[in-house]
Curated annotation (Swiss-Prot):
Organism, as annotated: Thermofilum pendens (strain DSM 2475 / Hrk 5)
Protein's name according to its UniProt entry: DNA primase DnaG
Binding site for Mg(2+) 2: 219, 221
Region (Disordered): 407-426
Cofactor(s) this protein requires: Mg(2+)
Cofactor note: Binds two Mg(2+) per subunit.
Length: 426
């Protein structure tokens, strides 16, 4: 009879033993019949069930040694005292039909306690997820700070050299090679950094460092060593810091940058260390299988001689300045029409798939891997911020830097012109 309340507070569990065979409806009838009139109208079971304060009475029976055992459950929405009174009333039932019965309340369960336990367990799960999301929030803050720092890049001097906002006011200046190096140091909070911008020392740099402590921060390879020698010979340098062996400044993490700057050494010690290395090490060149093309060999990473002069359409030339600092690459076809733009980090893989690629301009370094892919795809030219360590270079590909690009008088040019003096003879 009746129905289960929507949200019961308590469940009365009782056991009844009957000395005879009866049906479930006989037991339920006995409960309602014998409880009727005992507690008054406010606690009458039938009325309570009609109003939803007592739910459906569930009865399960089994036979045991000639006795019928009934397990009874009664859900209620009453308060604790009223529920206890109903439970005691159930225990007063001593007869079902013609058979004697004995009733005992086994327990009164607090349904809300179970709900509270589930709430606690769920709260623990949600709290753990919240804790897991905290690092992501920190990363978000770090990303915002990183972008703000990168946005602080300024142009210094008549050469418009990329640098940090504190390069003029700080008593110490960190000299790096290129714009990408400046961006990485700014990203990690070093605002007194400025780029050399090439092999020739700009006049603005010479005047800037006259009364400052100068730290030269170079890549940890042969190219970095050569740049260090060149700068030391032409400029006042107090200390030299090097990236870890084989690493570039633009790729270092915050910890690696801090460690490299902390381990800086005076110029004299740096030059002495280079001489010791030169005496101790025997250079061993591994045999390299190269494509069947005429090669130009360059033992240095940033050899200015390998950068060739190239003439490009006016539209392409004008876009060079916009490309700086974006870390993007633009793929052109033979007529210098844009095929697509891609992030520099994806350029090598994307070039393998593009069919109409003929020229590439990138805000990044021209690496040996990029040259190899360009050769297999039949590209005519690669133009980058600088040229990396090129061991093998096919003659039919022009390698140029932004500084060696010339603007054509024509807007559209079907083929690439290169200065005769810049080409290397076979």
């Amino acid at each position: 009879m009746g129905g289960l309340p929507v949200s019961p507070k308590y469940v009365i569990k009782a056991k009844m033993e009957i000395k005879g065979s009866v049906e479930k409806h006989d037991i339920i009838g006995a409960i309602f019949g014998q409880a009727e009139g005992l507690l008054g109208s406010e606690l009458d079971l039938r009325e309570l069930q009609k109003t939803g304060r007592v739910g459906r009475i569930e009865v399960n029976t089994r036979s045991q040694d000639g006795t019928l055992v009934a397990e009874i459950e009664i859900p209620t929405n009453l308060d604790m005292a009223e529920t206890a009174i109903i439970a005691a009333t159930i225990e007063s039932i001593d007869k079902v039909g013609p058979y004697p019965a004995k009733t005992e309340v086994v327990s009164i369960e607090d349904v809300r306690a179970e709900k509270r336990q589930k709430i606690i367990e769920r709260a623990v799960e949600l709290y753990k997820k919240l804790l897991e999301s905290v690092p992501e929030s920190r990363e978000l803050v770090e990303e915002v700070l990183r972008r703000v720092r990168v946005a602080e890049i300024v142009e210094y001097g008549e050469e418009k050299l990329p640098g940090g906002p504190e390069v003029e006011t700080s008593d110490t200046v960190i000299l790096v090679e290129g714009r990408a190096d400046v961006q990485n140091l700014l990203r990690h909070g070093y605002k007194n950094v400025i780029a050399l911008g090439g092999a020739t020392i700009p006049k603005s740099i010479k005047s800037l460092v006259e009364n400052k402590k100068v730290i030269l921060f170079v890549d940890g390879d042969r190219g970095g060593e050569l740049i260090a020698r060149n700068v030391i010979n032409a400029l006042k340098v107090d200390f030299v810091a090097r990236a870890p062996p084989g690493r570039e400044v633009e790729d270092l993490t915050a910890k690696e940058i801090a460690r490299a700057l902390q381990n800086k050494i005076p110029v004299d010690e740096f030059l002495q260390a280079l001489e010791r290395e030169k005496k101790q090490q025997k250079e061993v060149k591994a045999e390299i299988v190269v494509p069947p093309a005429k090669l130009i060999k360059s033992a240095t990473k940033k050899n200015p001689e390998i950068a060739q002069e190239i003439v490009v359409p006016a539209e392409v030339y004008e876009k060079l300045e916009e490309l700086k600092g974006t870390l993007e690459a633009v793929i052109y076809d033979e007529n210098w029409q844009v095929v697509e733009k891609v992030p520099v980090r994806d350029l090598v893989n994307r070039l393998k798939e593009v069919e109409r690629a003929a020229h590439v301009v990138l805000d990044g370094i021209i690496t040996q891997r990029l040259v190899d892919v360009a050769y297999t795809k039949g590209l005519k030219s690669l133009i980058g911020v600088r040229i990396g360590e090129i061991i093998r270079k096919p003659d039919n590909i022009v390698l140029a830097t932004f500084s060696s690009v010339k603007k054509s008088e024509e807007n559209i040019q079907e083929s690439v012109s290169t200065g005769e003096s810049a080409q290397t003879s076979p």
